[in-house]
Amino acid sequence: MSWKIIFTKRAEKDLKSFSPEVKKLIAKAINKKLLPNPDSALIPLKGKLKGIYKFRVGTYRILCEKRSTTLVIVVVKIGHRKEIYG
């Protein structure tokens, strides 16, 4: 069984704001690193973001929720590492 990626409306809006090159970089990272093995690619966050995972793509971060019972990864937010956590 394979994992399914779902983007929230917020994540879709974030993604649209990036250049085509960054979009391609993010898509490639999701397909080659995140989907094959999310357990090793996702890093759990702490504090007020507990329950959310980060996935690093260069200087960008993808914040996700992992629903292991249904094999779904929900992309919540996408942004530069300096701005994503605020």
Predicted regions and their residues:
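Residue-level recognition of conserved beta-strand positions in structured domain cores
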Residues: V57, K66, V75-I78
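Basic, Lys/Arg-enriched alpha-helical interface segments
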Residues: M1-R56, R67-T70, E83-G86
